[in-house]
Protein backbone atom coordinates (compact mmCIF):
# COMPACT_ATOMS: atom_id res chain seq x y z
CA UNK A 1 0.00 0.00 0.00
CA UNK A 2 2.79 2.34 0.92
CA UNK A 3 4.53 1.61 -2.38
CA UNK A 4 1.33 2.37 -4.32
CA UNK A 5 0.99 5.76 -2.58
CA UNK A 6 4.61 6.60 -3.35
CA UNK A 7 4.16 5.66 -7.01
CA UNK A 8 0.93 7.68 -7.26
CA UNK A 9 2.65 10.66 -5.64
CA UNK A 10 5.41 10.55 -8.22
CA UNK A 11 2.96 10.04 -11.09
CA UNK A 12 1.06 13.19 -10.07
CA UNK A 13 4.29 15.12 -9.58
CA UNK A 14 5.57 14.11 -13.01
CA UNK A 15 2.22 14.99 -14.59
CA UNK A 16 2.26 18.48 -13.04
CA UNK A 17 5.83 18.96 -14.17
CA UNK A 18 4.92 17.86 -17.70
CA UNK A 19 2.02 20.34 -17.81
CA UNK A 20 4.29 23.16 -16.63
CA UNK A 21 6.87 22.33 -19.26
CA UNK A 22 4.14 22.29 -21.89
CA UNK A 23 2.92 25.74 -20.86
CA UNK A 24 6.33 27.32 -20.39
CA UNK A 25 8.07 25.81 -23.41
CA UNK A 26 11.85 25.76 -23.36
CA UNK A 27 13.34 27.37 -20.27
CA UNK A 28 16.76 28.66 -19.49
CA UNK A 29 19.11 26.86 -17.15
CA UNK A 30 18.30 29.40 -14.47
CA UNK A 31 14.53 28.60 -14.65
CA UNK A 32 15.02 24.81 -14.72
CA UNK A 33 17.41 24.32 -11.85
CA UNK A 34 17.12 27.37 -9.58
CA UNK A 35 19.93 27.12 -7.00
CA UNK A 36 21.22 23.80 -8.38
CA UNK A 37 24.99 23.34 -8.49
CA UNK A 38 25.24 20.07 -10.45
CA UNK A 39 23.03 17.96 -12.72
CA UNK A 40 23.44 14.17 -13.01
CA UNK A 41 22.67 12.80 -16.48
CA UNK A 42 22.13 9.03 -16.75
CA UNK A 43 20.58 6.55 -19.17
CA UNK A 44 18.87 3.22 -18.50
CA UNK A 45 17.79 0.07 -20.31
CA UNK A 46 15.11 -2.35 -19.01
CA UNK A 47 14.43 -5.83 -20.40
CA UNK A 48 10.69 -5.30 -20.55
CA UNK A 49 8.03 -2.63 -20.82
CA UNK A 50 8.10 -0.19 -17.91
CA UNK A 51 6.61 3.25 -17.30
CA UNK A 52 8.05 6.46 -15.89
CA UNK A 53 6.57 5.91 -12.39
CA UNK A 54 8.30 2.52 -12.28
CA UNK A 55 11.68 4.16 -12.89
CA UNK A 56 11.08 6.91 -10.29
CA UNK A 57 9.87 4.36 -7.75
CA UNK A 58 12.95 2.19 -8.35
CA UNK A 59 15.28 5.19 -7.79
CA UNK A 60 13.68 6.10 -4.45
CA UNK A 61 13.03 2.52 -3.33
CA UNK A 62 16.38 0.89 -4.12
CA UNK A 63 18.53 3.77 -2.75
CA UNK A 64 16.56 4.05 0.50
CA UNK A 65 18.88 3.38 3.46
CA UNK A 66 21.79 2.71 1.09
CA UNK A 67 23.74 5.89 1.82
CA UNK A 68 22.52 6.71 5.32
CA UNK A 69 20.13 9.40 6.49
CA UNK A 70 22.30 12.29 5.26
CA UNK A 71 22.06 11.17 1.62
CA UNK A 72 18.55 9.73 1.65
CA UNK A 73 16.83 10.94 -1.54
CA UNK A 74 13.46 11.62 0.09
CA UNK A 75 15.01 13.71 2.86
CA UNK A 76 17.23 15.54 0.41
CA UNK A 77 14.23 16.35 -1.78
CA UNK A 78 12.22 17.62 1.20
CA UNK A 79 15.02 19.99 2.19
CA UNK A 80 15.45 21.16 -1.40
CA UNK A 81 18.98 19.81 -1.84
CA UNK A 82 17.78 17.49 -4.59
CA UNK A 83 15.45 18.80 -7.27
CA UNK A 84 12.70 17.03 -9.17
CA UNK A 85 13.95 13.87 -10.85
CA UNK A 86 13.10 13.89 -14.56
CA UNK A 87 12.64 10.64 -16.46
CA UNK A 88 12.07 10.19 -20.20
CA UNK A 89 11.12 6.71 -21.50
CA UNK A 90 10.46 5.05 -24.84
CA UNK A 91 9.87 1.39 -25.72
CA UNK A 92 11.34 -0.51 -28.63
CA UNK A 93 11.30 -4.24 -29.49
CA UNK A 94 9.99 -5.24 -26.07
CA UNK A 95 12.59 -3.22 -24.20
CA UNK A 96 12.43 0.19 -22.55
CA UNK A 97 15.09 2.85 -22.91
CA UNK A 98 15.28 6.28 -21.33
CA UNK A 99 17.16 9.06 -19.60
CA UNK A 100 17.29 10.25 -15.99
CA UNK A 101 18.13 13.80 -14.88
CA UNK A 102 18.80 14.58 -11.21
CA UNK A 103 19.44 18.23 -10.13
CA UNK A 104 21.68 18.48 -7.05
CA UNK A 105 22.61 21.24 -4.62
CA UNK A 106 25.07 18.99 -2.78
CA UNK A 107 28.80 19.48 -3.03
CA UNK A 108 30.91 17.81 -5.68
CA UNK A 109 31.79 14.69 -3.60
CA UNK A 110 28.24 14.02 -2.37
CA UNK A 111 26.86 14.46 -5.89
CA UNK A 112 29.38 11.93 -7.23
CA UNK A 113 28.38 9.43 -4.48
CA UNK A 114 24.71 9.90 -5.35
CA UNK A 115 25.44 9.36 -9.06
CA UNK A 116 27.31 6.14 -8.28
CA UNK A 117 24.35 4.97 -6.15
CA UNK A 118 22.07 5.23 -9.20
CA UNK A 119 24.17 2.64 -11.01
CA UNK A 120 23.41 0.08 -8.24
CA UNK A 121 19.76 -0.10 -9.33
CA UNK A 122 19.28 -3.44 -11.14
CA UNK A 123 15.51 -3.74 -11.42
CA UNK A 124 12.73 -1.42 -12.57
CA UNK A 125 9.25 -2.68 -11.89
CA UNK A 126 9.07 -6.34 -13.00
CA UNK A 127 12.00 -6.08 -15.41
CA UNK A 128 15.73 -6.27 -15.00
CA UNK A 129 17.43 -2.95 -15.67
CA UNK A 130 20.80 -1.30 -15.99
CA UNK A 131 21.56 2.39 -15.28
CA UNK A 132 24.71 4.16 -16.48
CA UNK A 133 25.77 7.70 -15.50
CA UNK A 134 26.78 9.68 -18.60
CA UNK A 135 28.11 12.85 -16.99
CA UNK A 136 27.78 15.34 -14.16
CA UNK A 137 27.32 18.90 -15.38
CA UNK A 138 28.44 21.92 -13.37
CA UNK A 139 25.42 24.22 -13.62
CA UNK A 140 27.45 27.18 -12.38
CA UNK A 141 29.62 26.95 -15.51
CA UNK A 142 26.44 26.95 -17.60
CA UNK A 143 25.18 29.92 -15.63
CA UNK A 144 28.45 31.75 -16.21
CA UNK A 145 28.11 31.21 -19.96
CA UNK A 146 24.52 32.40 -19.77
CA UNK A 147 25.57 35.48 -17.77
CA UNK A 148 28.28 36.39 -20.32
CA UNK A 149 25.95 36.01 -23.31
CA UNK A 150 23.11 37.84 -21.61
CA UNK A 151 25.43 40.63 -20.44
CA UNK A 152 26.52 41.14 -24.06
CA UNK A 153 22.90 41.47 -25.17
CA UNK A 154 22.08 43.88 -22.33
CA UNK A 155 25.15 46.02 -23.06
CA UNK A 156 24.33 46.21 -26.78
CA UNK A 157 20.76 47.26 -25.97
CA UNK A 158 22.01 49.80 -23.42
CA UNK A 159 24.48 51.31 -25.90
CA UNK A 160 21.82 51.55 -28.61
CA UNK A 161 19.45 53.31 -26.23
CA UNK A 162 22.05 55.50 -24.49
CA UNK A 163 23.58 57.17 -27.56
CA UNK A 164 20.31 58.64 -28.92
CA UNK A 165 19.36 59.72 -25.38
CA UNK A 166 22.68 61.57 -25.02
CA UNK A 167 22.22 63.25 -28.39
CA UNK A 168 18.66 64.22 -27.49
CA UNK A 169 19.82 65.62 -24.16
CA UNK A 170 22.56 67.68 -25.85
CA UNK A 171 20.11 68.96 -28.44
CA UNK A 172 17.61 69.91 -25.73
CA UNK A 173 20.29 71.91 -23.91
CA UNK A 174 21.31 73.67 -27.15
CA UNK A 175 17.67 74.46 -27.92
CA UNK A 176 17.23 75.94 -24.46
CA UNK A 177 20.33 78.14 -24.93
CA UNK A 178 19.19 79.26 -28.39
CA UNK A 179 15.70 80.02 -27.09
CA UNK A 180 17.27 82.11 -24.32
CA UNK A 181 19.32 84.06 -26.90
CA UNK A 182 16.18 84.76 -28.91
CA UNK A 183 14.77 88.23 -28.17
CA UNK A 184 11.55 90.06 -29.04
CA UNK A 185 12.18 93.23 -31.05
CA UNK A 186 9.93 96.20 -31.67
CA UNK A 187 6.30 96.82 -30.72
CA UNK A 188 5.26 93.75 -32.76
CA UNK A 189 7.63 91.62 -30.59
CA UNK A 190 9.28 90.04 -33.63
CA UNK A 191 11.60 87.04 -32.99
CA UNK A 192 15.18 88.24 -33.47
CA UNK A 193 18.79 87.40 -32.72
CA UNK A 194 20.61 89.20 -29.87
CA UNK A 195 22.72 91.35 -32.26
CA UNK A 196 19.78 92.93 -34.12
CA UNK A 197 19.49 96.03 -31.84
CA UNK A 198 23.04 97.23 -32.59
CA UNK A 199 24.22 95.47 -35.79
CA UNK A 200 24.88 97.59 -38.93
CA UNK A 201 23.44 94.86 -41.13
CA UNK A 202 20.50 92.52 -40.53
CA UNK A 203 19.06 89.42 -42.19
CA UNK A 204 15.28 89.36 -42.63
CA UNK A 205 13.78 85.85 -42.62
CA UNK A 206 10.25 84.49 -42.66
CA UNK A 207 9.61 82.93 -39.23
CA UNK A 208 10.80 82.14 -35.71
CA UNK A 209 12.15 78.71 -36.74
CA UNK A 210 14.40 80.38 -39.34
CA UNK A 211 15.87 82.72 -36.68
CA UNK A 212 16.49 79.73 -34.37
CA UNK A 213 18.26 77.80 -37.13
CA UNK A 214 20.53 80.76 -37.91
CA UNK A 215 21.25 81.14 -34.17
CA UNK A 216 22.15 77.44 -34.07
CA UNK A 217 24.86 78.12 -36.66
CA UNK A 218 26.19 81.31 -35.03
CA UNK A 219 24.31 83.97 -37.04
CA UNK A 220 22.80 86.36 -34.47
CA UNK A 221 21.58 89.33 -36.53
CA UNK A 222 18.44 87.75 -38.05
CA UNK A 223 14.89 89.00 -37.53
CA UNK A 224 11.63 87.37 -38.62
CA UNK A 225 8.74 88.93 -40.53
CA UNK A 226 6.27 86.51 -38.85
CA UNK A 227 3.49 86.58 -41.44
CA UNK A 228 2.70 87.67 -44.96
CA UNK A 229 2.48 91.41 -44.24
CA UNK A 230 5.75 93.22 -43.52
CA UNK A 231 5.73 94.82 -40.02
CA UNK A 232 6.48 98.53 -39.56
CA UNK A 233 9.57 97.63 -37.49
CA UNK A 234 11.16 95.90 -40.51
CA UNK A 235 10.37 98.89 -42.74
CA UNK A 236 12.04 101.28 -40.26
CA UNK A 237 15.08 99.04 -39.83
CA UNK A 238 15.52 98.79 -43.61
CA UNK A 239 15.98 102.57 -43.81
CA UNK A 240 18.74 102.52 -41.18
CA UNK A 241 20.58 99.24 -41.76
CA UNK A 242 22.03 97.18 -44.61
CA UNK A 243 19.27 94.60 -45.13
CA UNK A 244 19.57 91.13 -46.67
CA UNK A 245 16.27 89.35 -47.33
CA UNK A 246 16.78 85.60 -46.84
CA UNK A 247 13.67 83.65 -47.87
CA UNK A 248 12.67 80.03 -48.48
CA UNK A 249 13.24 78.45 -51.88
CA UNK A 250 9.53 77.91 -52.54
CA UNK A 251 6.51 79.87 -53.79
CA UNK A 252 5.81 81.30 -50.32
CA UNK A 253 9.35 82.66 -50.09
CA UNK A 254 8.95 84.38 -53.45
CA UNK A 255 5.70 86.09 -52.39
CA UNK A 256 7.24 87.41 -49.15
CA UNK A 257 10.28 88.62 -51.11
CA UNK A 258 8.05 90.57 -53.53
CA UNK A 259 6.30 92.32 -50.66
CA UNK A 260 9.60 93.10 -48.90
CA UNK A 261 11.01 94.68 -52.07
CA UNK A 262 7.88 96.81 -52.49
CA UNK A 263 7.59 98.23 -48.96
CA UNK A 264 11.11 97.99 -47.46
CA UNK A 265 14.53 99.31 -48.45
CA UNK A 266 16.24 95.96 -49.12
CA UNK A 267 19.91 95.96 -50.17
CA UNK A 268 20.52 92.27 -50.98
CA UNK A 269 18.49 89.14 -51.63
CA UNK A 270 19.47 85.57 -50.71
CA UNK A 271 17.35 82.46 -51.17
CA UNK A 272 17.49 78.96 -49.70
CA UNK A 273 18.29 76.22 -52.26
CA UNK A 274 15.34 75.52 -54.54
CA UNK A 275 12.62 73.54 -52.72
CA UNK A 276 14.20 73.96 -49.27
CA UNK A 277 13.33 76.12 -46.27
CA UNK A 278 15.74 78.28 -44.26
CA UNK A 279 14.82 76.45 -41.03
CA UNK A 280 16.12 73.10 -42.38
CA UNK A 281 19.41 74.29 -43.91
CA UNK A 282 22.82 73.14 -42.70
CA UNK A 283 25.57 75.62 -41.84
CA UNK A 284 27.30 75.01 -45.18
CA UNK A 285 24.07 75.67 -47.12
CA UNK A 286 23.37 78.87 -45.13
CA UNK A 287 26.87 80.27 -45.74
CA UNK A 288 26.72 79.40 -49.45
CA UNK A 289 23.30 81.05 -49.85
CA UNK A 290 24.39 84.25 -48.09
CA UNK A 291 27.61 84.46 -50.11
CA UNK A 292 25.57 84.14 -53.31
CA UNK A 293 23.31 87.08 -52.41
CA UNK A 294 22.22 89.32 -55.28
CA UNK A 295 21.76 93.13 -55.17
CA UNK A 296 18.10 94.05 -54.75
CA UNK A 297 18.05 96.22 -57.92
CA UNK A 298 19.21 93.25 -59.99
CA UNK A 299 16.49 91.05 -58.49
CA UNK A 300 13.82 93.65 -59.30
CA UNK A 301 15.07 94.12 -62.87
CA UNK A 302 15.94 90.55 -63.82
CA UNK A 303 13.29 88.59 -61.95
CA UNK A 304 10.18 90.70 -61.46
CA UNK A 305 10.38 92.77 -64.66
CA UNK A 306 12.03 90.30 -67.05
CA UNK A 307 10.44 87.21 -65.44
CA UNK A 308 13.68 85.29 -64.98
CA UNK A 309 14.31 82.65 -62.32
CA UNK A 310 16.33 83.71 -59.25
CA UNK A 311 18.50 80.59 -59.41
CA UNK A 312 19.34 81.24 -63.08
CA UNK A 313 20.61 84.69 -62.09
CA UNK A 314 22.79 83.12 -59.37
CA UNK A 315 24.30 80.63 -61.84
CA UNK A 316 24.92 83.40 -64.38
CA UNK A 317 26.62 85.48 -61.69
CA UNK A 318 28.94 82.58 -60.82
CA UNK A 319 29.76 81.98 -64.50
CA UNK A 320 30.53 85.68 -65.01
CA UNK A 321 32.79 85.69 -61.95
CA UNK A 322 34.69 82.65 -63.21
CA UNK A 323 34.97 84.27 -66.66
CA UNK A 324 36.48 87.45 -65.18
CA UNK A 325 39.04 85.42 -63.26
CA UNK A 326 40.05 83.61 -66.46
CA UNK A 327 40.31 86.94 -68.32
CA UNK A 328 42.59 88.37 -65.64
CA UNK A 329 44.88 85.36 -65.96
CA UNK A 330 45.09 85.84 -69.74
CA UNK A 331 45.79 89.60 -69.58
CA UNK A 332 48.27 89.45 -66.72
CA UNK A 333 51.45 88.03 -68.49
CA UNK A 334 52.06 90.87 -71.04
CA UNK A 335 51.44 93.57 -68.41
CA UNK A 336 55.06 93.76 -67.05
CA UNK A 337 56.55 94.70 -70.48
CA UNK A 338 56.00 98.49 -70.36
CA UNK A 339 57.07 98.69 -66.69
CA UNK A 340 60.60 97.36 -66.04
CA UNK A 341 60.63 98.48 -62.38
CA UNK A 342 60.65 95.58 -59.87
CA UNK A 343 57.91 97.07 -57.70
CA UNK A 344 54.46 95.45 -58.18
CA UNK A 345 52.55 98.73 -58.46
CA UNK A 346 53.38 99.52 -62.13
CA UNK A 347 52.29 95.97 -63.06
CA UNK A 348 48.91 96.27 -61.41
CA UNK A 349 48.03 99.75 -62.70
CA UNK A 350 47.79 99.06 -66.46
CA UNK A 351 45.53 96.08 -65.84
CA UNK A 352 42.50 97.93 -64.38
CA UNK A 353 43.00 100.73 -66.92
CA UNK A 354 42.78 98.33 -69.82
CA UNK A 355 39.72 96.60 -68.40
CA UNK A 356 37.91 99.80 -67.41
CA UNK A 357 38.44 101.38 -70.82
CA UNK A 358 36.82 98.41 -72.54
CA UNK A 359 33.72 98.66 -70.37
CA UNK A 360 33.37 102.42 -70.07
CA UNK A 361 34.13 103.75 -73.55
CA UNK A 362 30.91 102.61 -75.27
CA UNK A 363 28.77 104.16 -72.51
CA UNK A 364 30.25 107.55 -71.57
CA UNK A 365 33.41 109.40 -70.61
CA UNK A 366 33.16 109.96 -66.83
CA UNK A 367 36.03 111.21 -64.69
CA UNK A 368 38.99 109.15 -65.99
CA UNK A 369 41.38 111.08 -63.75
CA UNK A 370 39.48 109.95 -60.64
CA UNK A 371 39.61 106.32 -61.72
CA UNK A 372 43.35 106.67 -62.30
CA UNK A 373 43.72 108.18 -58.86
CA UNK A 374 41.92 105.37 -57.03
CA UNK A 375 42.38 102.46 -59.48
CA UNK A 376 44.96 100.69 -57.35
CA UNK A 377 42.78 100.90 -54.24
CA UNK A 378 39.64 99.84 -56.12
CA UNK A 379 41.39 96.68 -57.30
CA UNK A 380 42.52 95.94 -53.76
CA UNK A 381 39.03 96.09 -52.22
CA UNK A 382 37.47 94.28 -55.19
CA UNK A 383 39.85 91.34 -54.75
CA UNK A 384 39.05 91.07 -51.03
CA UNK A 385 36.68 88.24 -50.11
CA UNK A 386 35.47 90.13 -47.01
CA UNK A 387 33.88 93.57 -46.73
CA UNK A 388 36.76 96.06 -46.58
CA UNK A 389 37.20 99.83 -46.53
CA UNK A 390 40.40 101.85 -47.14
CA UNK A 391 40.78 105.29 -45.55
CA UNK A 392 43.16 107.56 -47.50
CA UNK A 393 44.77 110.90 -46.64
CA UNK A 394 45.44 113.82 -49.02
CA UNK A 395 48.64 112.15 -50.28
CA UNK A 396 46.64 109.04 -51.32
CA UNK A 397 48.32 106.97 -48.61
CA UNK A 398 46.35 104.32 -46.74
CA UNK A 399 45.92 105.42 -43.13
CA UNK A 400 43.57 102.59 -42.13
CA UNK A 401 42.25 99.31 -43.53
CA UNK A 402 39.04 98.36 -41.72
CA UNK A 403 35.88 96.21 -42.09
CA UNK A 404 32.97 98.11 -43.63
CA UNK A 405 30.91 97.73 -40.44
CA UNK A 406 33.45 99.92 -38.57
CA UNK A 407 33.44 102.67 -41.19
CA UNK A 408 30.93 104.97 -39.46
CA UNK A 409 32.71 104.83 -36.09
CA UNK A 410 36.15 105.39 -37.65
CA UNK A 411 34.97 108.46 -39.58
CA UNK A 412 33.57 109.97 -36.39
CA UNK A 413 36.92 109.50 -34.63
CA UNK A 414 39.24 110.59 -37.51
CA UNK A 415 39.44 114.06 -39.03
CA UNK A 416 42.27 113.43 -41.51
CA UNK A 417 40.39 111.20 -43.99
CA UNK A 418 40.45 112.58 -47.54
CA UNK A 419 38.91 109.61 -49.41
CA UNK A 420 37.10 106.36 -48.63
CA UNK A 421 37.33 103.35 -50.97
CA UNK A 422 35.25 100.30 -50.05
CA UNK A 423 33.59 97.27 -51.66
CA UNK A 424 30.09 97.90 -50.28
CA UNK A 425 26.95 99.78 -51.31
CA UNK A 426 26.84 103.59 -51.19
CA UNK A 427 23.62 104.47 -49.36
CA UNK A 428 22.12 107.84 -48.48
CA UNK A 429 22.85 107.28 -44.79
CA UNK A 430 26.54 106.59 -45.53
CA UNK A 431 26.78 109.67 -47.79
CA UNK A 432 25.44 111.88 -45.00
CA UNK A 433 27.90 110.42 -42.45
CA UNK A 434 30.90 110.76 -44.80
CA UNK A 435 29.95 114.31 -45.78
CA UNK A 436 29.74 115.41 -42.13
CA UNK A 437 33.25 113.98 -41.54
CA UNK A 438 34.81 116.24 -44.20
CA UNK A 439 35.68 113.42 -46.66
CA UNK A 440 36.11 114.61 -50.27
CA UNK A 441 35.83 111.33 -52.21
CA UNK A 442 33.59 108.30 -51.59
CA UNK A 443 34.31 105.30 -53.85
CA UNK A 444 32.06 102.21 -53.61
CA UNK A 445 30.81 99.21 -55.56
CA UNK A 446 27.47 100.78 -56.45
CA UNK A 447 24.85 103.33 -55.36
CA UNK A 448 21.43 102.55 -53.99
CA UNK A 449 18.51 104.93 -53.31
CA UNK A 450 20.71 108.03 -53.34
CA UNK A 451 18.50 111.13 -53.43
CA UNK A 452 20.83 113.86 -52.09
CA UNK A 453 24.39 114.59 -53.21
CA UNK A 454 26.39 116.99 -51.00
CA UNK A 455 28.34 119.58 -53.01
CA UNK A 456 31.51 119.00 -50.96
CA UNK A 457 31.61 115.22 -51.71
CA UNK A 458 32.44 113.45 -54.98
CA UNK A 459 30.84 110.01 -55.35
CA UNK A 460 32.43 107.42 -57.64
CA UNK A 461 31.35 103.80 -58.30
CA UNK A 462 33.44 100.95 -59.70
CA UNK A 463 31.40 100.96 -62.94
CA UNK A 464 32.27 104.62 -63.56
Swiss-Prot record:
**Residues annotated to bind Mg(2+) 2:** 248, 250
One cellular-component annotation, GO: cytoplasm
One GO biological process from the UniProt record?
A: DNA replication, synthesis of primer
Compositionally skewed regions (Pro residues) per UniProt = 333-345
What keywords does the record list, in alphabetical order? DNA replication, DNA-directed RNA polymerase, Exosome, Magnesium, Metal-binding, Nucleotidyltransferase, Primosome, Transcription, Transferase
Q: Which coenzymes or cofactors are required? A: Mg(2+)
Task: Cite the record's Basic and acidic residues compositional bias ranges.
Answer: 322-332, 346-359
Q: Which reaction does it catalyse?
A: ssDNA + n NTP = ssDNA/pppN(pN)n-1 hybrid + (n-1) diphosphate
Q: How is the cofactor bound?
A: Binds two Mg(2+) per subunit.
Which is one GO molecular function term here?
metal ion binding
Renumbered residue ranges of the record's region Disordered: 322-359
Q: Which InterPro entries does its entry note?
A: DnaG_primase (IPR050219), Primase_DnaG_arc (IPR020607), TOPRIM_DnaG/twinkle (IPR034154), TOPRIM_dom (IPR006171)
Give residue ranges for domain Toprim: 200-274
Residues annotated as binding Mg(2+) 1: 206, 248
EC number(s) of the enzyme? 2.7.7.101
Record family assignment: Belongs to the archaeal DnaG primase family.
What's this protein's function?
A: RNA polymerase that catalyzes the synthesis of short RNA molecules used as primers for DNA polymerase during DNA replication. Also part of the exosome, which is a complex involved in RNA degradation. Acts as a poly(A)-binding protein that enhances the interaction between heteromeric, adenine-rich transcripts and the exosome.
| HAMAP family linked to this entry | DNA_primase_DnaG_arc (MF_00007)
> PANTHER family under this entry?
DNA PRIMASE (PTHR30313:SF2)
SUBUNIT field: Forms a ternary complex with MCM helicase and DNA. Component of the archaeal exosome complex.
Output the NCBIfam families linked to this UniProt entry: PRK04031.1-1
Give the protein's recorded name: DNA primase DnaG
- State the organism of origin: Thermococcus onnurineus (strain NA1)
